Amino acid sequence: MDYFPIFCQLQNKACLLVGGGEVAERKARLLLDAGAAVTVNACEFTEQFHDWAEQGLLSLVSGEFAPELLAEKWLVIAATDQVAVNALVYQSANQQRVFCNVVDDPKRTSFIMPSIIDRSPIMIAISSGGKAPVLARLLREKLEAMLPQHLGQLAQLAGNLRQRVKQHFAAMTDRRRFWEKLLTHDRLAQSLANEDQVQVEQHVEQLFNAPLSDRGEVVLVGAGPGDAGLLTLKGLQQIQQADVVVYDRLVSDEVMNLVRRDAERIFVGKESGRHTVPQDQINQILLQQAQQGKRVVRLKGGDPFIFGRGGEELETLADYNIPFSVVPGITAASGCSAYSGIPLTHRDHAQSVRLITGHAKKDSQLDWANLAAEKQTLVFYMGLSQAGEIQQQLIRHGMPAATPVALVENGTSRHQRVVSGELSQLALLSQQVSSPSLIIVGSVVSLREKLNWFSSAEHGKTGMKEQVERVG
């Protein structure tokens, strides 16, 4: 370990910054954020430094650096573009035993400034020891994306509750279970993010008053259409906190690989027209797992509220007062069309888009005359087995037989395949693809040849490319 990681309390501590340019500005912001009493020494200063000085946030000392400026200082940062000045600052600081950082000069540095993730009071520092600062920055960006913005508020809430928790729970195991429930409570987290103090207090009281074993919850998460990169950040956070993940066939292996390793996985195998596990039984699985005090993620392909029967599952939970929340996902229509180079709307082609299920209840009747209207795009989910009926009804109700159509198989994945042609060929085209597939009908499909980007790019280590076929 080349450097000992340490967090310094600089509130009202005297610190010196040598340099008055843009680099020094960035360092000054960090010192000011930490509450330090900052003195800045330089021959010239940027406008920002003058503004800070006028506001009384720091002091300016104009002129050449002199060792006397280090008197009674806790630390110094040298951020000039003059090597000799920076060397003098470092030498003087060493002689007076003052911690010194020389920007971009690891050999003349007694402390380094890491990349920082600030979720005060939670602070995360990342350093490469000056070896690879760009790598440290990239790591910080990845962690920034993973950590929710309300994390600091959650930590502050936990701090406020510590004494009460000690008094309320005598056993350490009960305290630990309480903290785990509180710190992973999705609805509480959302209330903190919304700054809804009333809801926050209600959730906290519910956690204190309900038996620990009864404090399960269900989070309905949309996994997106296939590409794991399309899973939302919040969705990723949820599947990595889950005790149990209930998932179906439309969730890709790549997404499942992101699930918390020790989480229980329950496969319910849903697909169009055939359910390995009936919907009523899925509802009961969610209910029973939550009643055991577990954090349950119901992971569904696409978006759970678009032909995903997510609403039906939540109704059951609501009937039994099980806490639940929803994390939307990118629906198949959006993902598959984008990865196929087919804009769902376009001023010259379509002013609206219709999302239609090809697997509705038996007594449901579609308004085919309305669907056959011009200037719109139709997207049929789970419509492969009904392709012949869709073709026949749309043509019968006035849609031109030459209307462009596309079928997208395994959309957004490395196995994506697109078959395109005309409406009059839809039944034939459907025989060339397998489920899961999406049917897109409308003149926007004609833009695919010009706008398709996915087929020309290699994906992953396999270098596989989208397969494209056209009939006609």
Swiss-Prot record:
Task: Identify residues that carry Phosphoserine.
Answer: S128
User: Any idea which UniProt keywords this protein has?
Assistant: Cobalamin biosynthesis, Lyase, Methyltransferase, Multifunctional enzyme, NAD, Oxidoreductase, Phosphoprotein, Porphyrin biosynthesis, S-adenosyl-L-methionine, Transferase
Per UniProt, NAD(+) binds at E22, V23, C43, E44
- Residue numbers spanned by region Uroporphyrinogen-III C-methyltransferase: 216-472
Q: Which CDD domains match?
A: SUMT
Q: Which GO terms describe its biological process?
A: cobalamin biosynthetic process; methylation; siroheme biosynthetic process
Entry EC no(s):
2.1.1.107, 1.3.1.76, 4.99.1.4
According to UniProt, this protein's pathway is: Cofactor biosynthesis; adenosylcobalamin biosynthesis; precorrin-2 from uroporphyrinogen III: step 1/1; Cofactor biosynthesis; adenosylcobalamin biosynthesis; sirohydrochlorin from precorrin-2: step 1/1; Porphyrin-containing compound metabolism; siroheme biosynthesis; precorrin-2 from uroporphyrinogen III: step 1/1; Porphyrin-containing compound metabolism; siroheme biosynthesis; siroheme from sirohydrochlorin: step 1/1
Asked whether the keyword Methyltransferase is assigned, the reply is: yes
Amino acids binding S-adenosyl-L-methionine? P225, G301, G302, D303, I306, T331, A332, M382, G411
**What is the protein's known function?**
Then it catalyzes the NAD-dependent ring dehydrogenation of precorrin-2 to yield sirohydrochlorin. Finally, it catalyzes the ferrochelation of sirohydrochlorin to yield siroheme.
Protein family: In the N-terminal section; belongs to the precorrin-2 dehydrogenase / sirohydrochlorin ferrochelatase family. In the C-terminal section; belongs to the precorrin methyltransferase family.
Q: What is this protein called?
A: Siroheme synthase 2
Q: Which organism is it from?
A: Yersinia enterocolitica serotype O:8 / biotype 1B (strain NCTC 13174 / 8081)
High-level lineage: Bacteria, Pseudomonadati, Pseudomonadota, Gammaproteobacteria, Enterobacterales
